[in-house]
Structures are given as C-alpha cells and as structure tokens.
A protein has these predicted regions:
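Extracytoplasmic ligand-binding site segments that recognize negatively charged/polar headgroups
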Residues: 2-146
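A bilobed periplasmic-binding-protein/Venus flytrap-type ligand-binding module shared by bacterial periplasmic
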Residues: 54-63, 98-100, 182-196, 212-216
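Solvent-exposed, polar/charged alpha-helical surfaces in well-ordered, non-transmembrane soluble domains
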Residues: 16, 72, 119, 123, ...
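Periplasmic-binding protein-like
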Residues: 37, 53-55, 118-127, 165-191, ...
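Conserved C-terminal helix/tail region of periplasmic/extracytoplasmic solute-binding proteins
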Residues: 243-273
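Mature extracytoplasmic/periplasmic domains
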Residues: 188-248
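Paired acidic/hydrophobic, glycine-rich loop segments that form the ligand-binding mouth/hinge
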Residues: 6-9, 134-135, 151-156, 172
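A ligand-binding cleft/hinge motif common to bilobed small-molecule-binding domains
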Residues: 15-17, 152-170
C-alpha cells in the first residue's frame, strides 16, 4: 500500500532489518555528496545518519571529586562503594562487561560473537549483579544519580547534557568505552513523494544545517564536516567530538539483529537467578 509517511527516522536495528526486508527505498548517495562525507556507521544503502547518540558512564561531579575513568572503575566497588545502574537488557550490558574485563573496544563484538565471549560477559556481570539497580527509561538513570541512590550509572549523553543545562547539575560523562549509535533517515517504500523526500534528506544532511543541531540538543553529527565545524564550547558534550569518538565503540546493529532474541532469553534467565 501507500505509506502514511515519506521520511522516517529509525534506529540502527530498524534500518538493518527494514532494508533487508525491502521496507525502504534505496537512497541517492550522489545527492548526499558521497558516502565518504559521513561516519562509516552512518552509511547504508537505505539510510543516512541523522543523529549520533551515546550510552556512557555518568557520575555526579559534586559528589565524586575523583570519578571513574573506565569500565574497570565502574565494576570496582571497593574503590567506588555504592550502587551502580545499568540499562536492563543484554544490549550494552554485555559490551560494557567485556570492556570491564579488559577487552579493547575494537575487539568487543569479535569476542561477543563466540560462545566463550558471551560466557565471559555474563561471568563479569555476576561480579556486579548485587550492586546493580536496573533502569528502563531514559529519564531513570539521572533520577537515580540525582537522588544518590546510585553512585554512577550508564545514561544517554543527550540526557546528561540536558539536565546539566536545565537544572544546573554537574553530571560528568566518561567517554572512553562509551557506545555510540546512529539514528538514520529512511524513505518508506512506495512513497508517492520519493523525490521530495530525498531532497529533504539531502537538505537535512548538509553540514551547514546539521551543525545547528547541538545548539538545541547534544547529539553528534554523522556528517564529518559538520561534526568538525561545531563551536568548541559545544564539542565537549558530543559523541562525535574527535577526542570523545577516539575511545568509543559503534553499536553493531547486525550483531544485535542476529542475536537479540537468544541473548534476551539468557539475560532474563540470568536476572531471575
């Protein structure tokens, strides 16, 4: 049938699945200036990155003068006594556990793609399990941090920057070992306005237009030229700032599309133990 919408912003797994299943039109990359203009993780036959957002460690700089700097610190309840908070589910939790166990970011999905790697991640989660408060919605971790219920948490970078700005908090982000994900523009299959939709995506993807986004919300920019043009005062809060991107890991949507069902079952069984 004819879709109700022409252009939609989708998360990484939705992009992977929808493109494979023929739900989206193929993009005209010539209109976008070529694939090399964008972060590699922002490039797909059916979609182009719209925003980049990260999940990272956050802590209250007013309460912890010397905060954590790594996932090993997040797991170290002797050095940093108190509860921690993680997003409920295997996605992110398993990657963070492997990094806490010494796996370099670039090798996380290689390790996690083996049965031994999955066992290793769950074994590492076992260590922290008594100290974890699980969160499910994006507002929860910052509420837990503000109330003092947890000493550190994972959280979305845009939320952290937003509450610092709106409520004068001093929540700090630990960028090394953060995981960034990209939401992408797609055109729904059989859109009657395909050409206009492509023109809109091209307009939204131009560096001079993307560069305005961080003034309103601390999302990173998939267009490399736009990311480099962000004013210095705003760069520190963005996943795409060069120093923040350097130690970060791109979410592997293909891995999660292939493994989410099985790992969800295992995670839920583990949680119930």
């Amino acid at each position: 049938g004819v879709p109700n919408w022409d252009v939609v912003q989708v998360e990484a797994e939705e992009l992977t699945l929808g493109c494979a299943d023929g739900f989206y039109e193929k993009l005209d990359w010539d209109k976008l200036g070529g694939k090399d203009k964008f972060l590699p993780a922002a490039v797909n036959d059916c979609g182009v990155g719209a925003i980049v957002w990260s999940t990272a460690i956050a802590y209250d700089g007013d309460k912890l003068k010397e905060g954590p700097t790594s996932w090993a610190d997040f797991w170290d309840v002797q050095k940093f006594p108190g509860k921690r908070s993680l997003r409920r589910g295997p996605k992110y939790s398993l990657e963070f556990a492997l990094m806490a166990d010494g796996v370099p970011p670039a090798e996380v999905y290689k390790v996690l793609s083996t049965p031994e790697g999955v066992d290793r991640a769950f074994k590492k989660l076992d260590e922290l399990k008594p100290h974890i408060v699980w969160w499910e919605s994006g507002a929860q971790p910052l509420q837990l941090l503000a109330s003092g219920e947890v000493v550190m948490t994972t959280a979305y970078n845009g939320r952290i920057a937003g509450i610092n700005k709106s409520e004068g908090k001093n929540f700090k982000i630990v960028w090394p070992g953060s995981i960034y994900a990209i939401d992408s523009w797609v055109i729904l299959k059989n859109s009657p306005n395909k050409d206009a939709a492509m023109d809109f995506i091209a307009f939204a993807s131009q560096p001079e237009n993307q560069v305005k986004l961080p003034e309103y919300v601390a999302y990173g920019l998939p267009n490399k030229e736009a990311a480099n043009a962000v004013p210095a005062a705003l760069q520190a809060d963005l996943p795409t700032a060069p120093e923040n991107l350097a130690g970060a890991l791109a979410l592997d949507a293909d891995f999660w599309v292939d493994n989410i069902e099985e790992l969800n079952k295992r995670f839920n069984a583990w949680l119930a133990q």
